[in-house]
From Swiss-Prot:
One of its GO terms (cellular component) is plasma membrane. Keywords: Cell membrane, Membrane, Transmembrane, Transmembrane helix. It is found in: Cell membrane. It is a multi-pass membrane protein. The keyword Transmembrane applies. It comes from the Archaea. This is Uncharacterized protein MJ0703.1. Its main location: membrane. The chain crosses the membrane at residues 14-34, 35-55, 76-96.
C-alpha cells in the first residue's frame, strides 16, 4: 500500500513539473520562431510561423474560451497580443530587409 502511494506521488510530481515547463517551452518556441522569421528572407515562412503560433496557443485559447465569465475578455486579449507579436516580427523582418538593401 505504501509503495503505491509513493508511485502516485511521483506521478503527481511529474505532472506538476510538466505543467511548470509547458509555458517555458511555449515562450522558447515563440522566440525561436521569431528569430527564424527575422533571419529568413522567404516570406513564405510567415504562414509557417502563424501556423505554429496558432497551434501553440490553441489549447490556451480553448481554456480561456471555456470559462464563460471571461471568454470575451480573454479572446480580445489573445487577439490583441497576437497582433502585437506578429507586428513586431514583421517590423523587425522589414527593418532587416531594408538594411540589407542599403
Amino acid at each position: 500500500m505504501v509503495g503505491n502511494m509513493n508511485i502516485r506521488d511521483k506521478i503527481k510530481s511529474i505532472k506538476n513539473w510538466i505543467n511548470f515547463i509547458k509555458p517555458i517551452i511555449t515562450i522558447v518556441g515563440i522566440v525561436i520562431s521569431a528569430v527564424a522569421f527575422t533571419i529568413s528572407i522567404l516570406w513564405g515562412m510567415l504562414f509557417l510561423i502563424l501556423f505554429l503560433i496558432l497551434i501553440t496557443f490553441s489549447k490556451t485559447i480553448r481554456k480561456i474560451l471555456s470559462k464563460k465569465e471571461r471568454s470575451y475578455q480573454g479572446l480580445i486579449l489573445s487577439i490583441i497580443g497576437s497582433i502585437i507579436i506578429i507586428s513586431i516580427i514583421v517590423y523587425s523582418h522589414c527593418y532587416i530587409e531594408f538594411k540589407l538593401l542599403i
